[in-house]
C-alpha cells in the first residue's frame, strides 16, 4: 500500500457560515476524505468581516487586525480537525488555505482580489507549512482569479461520454461545464447562491439560514420583482466572469426592494430563492439543453432550492456530488487541499478558458512552519 499523502484544505466562502477544514489523502487515483470539521466564526469576528467587505474608514488598521484573527481561527480549525484523527501535524505535507475574501474586484483597470487570514500565523500555530494566496497569480495573468474549483472538478468528476455540470452553491453560485468530449471545460460564477436568502432571513427572523428553504416555500414569488432582480447587468455578461459581495449584497437588495415594501416577507424570500434558481438555470440551459447536474456546497442541502432548480432544467438528471462519491458539503474544502497538492508537485491549477488568464500557472505561495 502506498504511503499516505496528507494535505489539509481550509475554506471560508462569501456566506461566512464557518471555516470548513478537511484532511485528504492524495496517494490514490482519487482523493480520499479522511476527516472533516467546521469551525464556527465568532459573532464579533463575523461582524468585523462583514463590515470590512464594504468600503469604510480606518480600513487598514481593521484589515491588519482581522488578518491575524482570521489566521488564528483557521489554525484553530486545523488543530480541532487533527484532534478528531490519529494523524499528527508532522504527517501532513501542507495546508491549502483559501483565506477569507474581503474584496474581489478583477474588472478594474488594475484588477485585484484580497483574501485575509495570515498564512504565517496558521503555519506557526499548527506547525504545518501553509500554501495560500491562490488567486492573485491568475489575476496577474489577466484572469479573474475565480472560479478556481473547475480544474479540480475536471480531474475528479469528468467522465468521457457524459455531459456534466458541477454546480457549487455557496454565498455565490458557480458552475463547471464538463462536456464529456474534446470540447473545452468552462466555468464561471452565475450570481447569488445563498448570500441573499441568508441575509434576508438573518435580518428578519434572526436565523442564520433558511433551513430546507421552508420559509421561502411558505411564500409566493412576485414575478415583477423577480424580473427586476434578473435584469442586473451581471447576468447578461459574457463569461469568463466572477462576482461576489461587491455586487450582490444587502445594500443592493434594499435598493431593489424599495418599491416592494408592501410584500409579505416570505414572498420576498421566495422571490430571492427563485433569483438564485433562475440565474443558475438560465446559464446551465445555455451551455447545453441536457445532461447531468451534480450540486455541491451549502445550497445542495436546501430542499426547496434543489426542487425548484430541477424544474427549471428539465433536460438534466439532478443529484448532489455525493452520488459521485464526494460529499457535497466538503467539495470546496477538498478542492483547496488539491490546490495545495498541485503547488507541492509544481503542477498548474488554473484553467485559462475559465478564468481568462493568458496561460496556466502554478498557483499560490508556500509559508513554512519552521
Swiss-Prot record:
ATP binds at residues 13-20. It comes from the Bacteria. Pathway: Amino-sugar metabolism; 1,6-anhydro-N-acetylmuramate degradation; Cell wall biogenesis; peptidoglycan recycling. It catalyses: 1,6-anhydro-N-acetyl-beta-muramate + ATP + H2O = N-acetyl-D-muramate 6-phosphate + ADP + H(+). Transmembrane segments: none annotated. Its EC number is 2.7.1.170. Signal peptide: none annotated. SUPFAM superfamilies: Actin-like ATPase domain. One of its GO terms (molecular function) is kinase activity. It is an enzyme of class 2 (transferase). Keywords: ATP-binding, Carbohydrate metabolism, Kinase, Nucleotide-binding, Transferase. InterPro entries: Anhydro_N_Ac-Mur_kinase (IPR005338), ATPase_NBD (IPR043129). GO terms for biological process: 1,6-anhydro-N-acetyl-beta-muramic acid catabolic process; amino sugar metabolic process; peptidoglycan turnover. Catalyzes the specific phosphorylation of 1,6-anhydro-N-acetylmuramic acid (anhMurNAc) with the simultaneous cleavage of the 1,6-anhydro ring, generating MurNAc-6-P. Is required for the utilization of anhMurNAc either imported from the medium or derived from its own cell wall murein, and thus plays a role in cell wall recycling. Belongs to the anhydro-N-acetylmuramic acid kinase family. HAMAP family: AnhMurNAc_kinase. This is Anhydro-N-acetylmuramic acid kinase. It comes from Shewanella frigidimarina (strain NCIMB 400).
Amino acid at each position: 500500500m502506498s504511503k499516505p499523502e496528507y494535505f489539509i484544505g481550509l475554506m471560508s466562502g462569501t456566506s461566512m457560515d464557518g471555516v470548513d477544514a478537511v484532511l485528504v489523502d492524495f496517494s490514490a487515483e482519487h482523493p480520499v476524505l479522511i476527516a472533516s470539521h467546521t469551525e464556527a466564526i465568532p459573532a464579533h469576528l463575523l461582524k468585523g468581516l462583514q463590515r470590512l467587505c464594504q468600503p469604510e474608514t480606518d480600513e487598514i488598521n481593521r484589515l491588519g487586525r482581522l488578518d491575524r484573527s482570521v489566521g488564528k481561527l483557521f489554525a484553530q480549525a486545523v488543530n480541532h480537525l487533527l484532534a478528531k484523527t490519529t494523524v499528527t501535524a508532522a504527517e501532513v505535507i501542507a495546508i491549502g488555505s483559501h483565506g477569507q475574501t474581503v474584496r474581489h474586484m478583477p474588472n478594474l483597470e488594475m484588477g485585484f482580489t484580497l483574501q485575509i487570514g495570515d498564512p504565517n500565523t496558521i503555519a506557526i500555530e499548527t506547525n504545518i507549512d501553509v500554501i495560500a494566496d491562490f488567486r492573485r497569480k491568475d489575476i496577474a495573468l489577466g484572469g479573474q482569479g475565480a472560479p478556481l474549483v473547475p480544474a479540480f472538478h475536471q480531474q475528479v468528476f469528468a467522465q468521457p461520454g457524459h455531459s456534466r455540470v458541477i454546480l457549487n452553491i455557496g454565498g455565490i453560485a458557480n458552475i463547471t461545464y464538463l462536456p464529456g468530449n474534446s470540447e473545452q471545460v468552462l466555468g464561471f460564477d452565475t450570481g447569488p447562491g445563498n448570500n441573499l436568502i441568508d441575509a434576508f432571513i438573518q435580518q428578519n427572523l434572526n436565523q442564520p439560514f433558511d433551513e430546507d428553504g421552508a420559509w421561502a416555500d411558505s411564500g409566493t414569488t412576485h414575478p415583477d420583482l423577480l424580473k427586476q432582480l434578473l435584469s442586473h447587468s451581471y447576468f447578461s455578461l459574457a463569461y469568463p466572469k466572477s462576482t461576489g459581495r461587491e455586487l450582490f449584497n444587502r445594500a443592493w437588495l434594499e435598493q431593489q426592494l424599495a418599491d416592494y415594501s408592501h410584500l409579505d416577507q416570505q414572498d420576498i424570500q421566495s422571490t430571492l430563492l427563485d433569483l438564485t434558481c433562475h440565474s443558475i438555470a438560465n446559464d446551465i440551459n445555455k451551455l447545453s439543453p441536457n445532461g447531468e447536474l451534480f450540486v455541491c456546497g451549502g445550497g445542495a442541502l436546501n430542499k426547496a432550492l434543489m426542487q425548484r432548480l430541477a424544474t427549471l432544467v428539465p433536460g438534466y438528471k439532478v443529484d448532489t456530488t455525493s452520488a459521485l462519491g464526494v460529499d457535497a458539503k466538503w467539495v470546496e474544502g477538498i478542492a483547496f487541499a488539491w490546490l495545495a497538492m498541485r503547488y507541492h508537485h509544481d503542477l498548474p491549477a488554473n484553467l485559462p478558458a475559465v478564468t481568462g488568464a493568458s496561460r496556466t500557472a502554478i498557483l499560490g505561495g508556500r509559508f513554512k512552519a519552521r
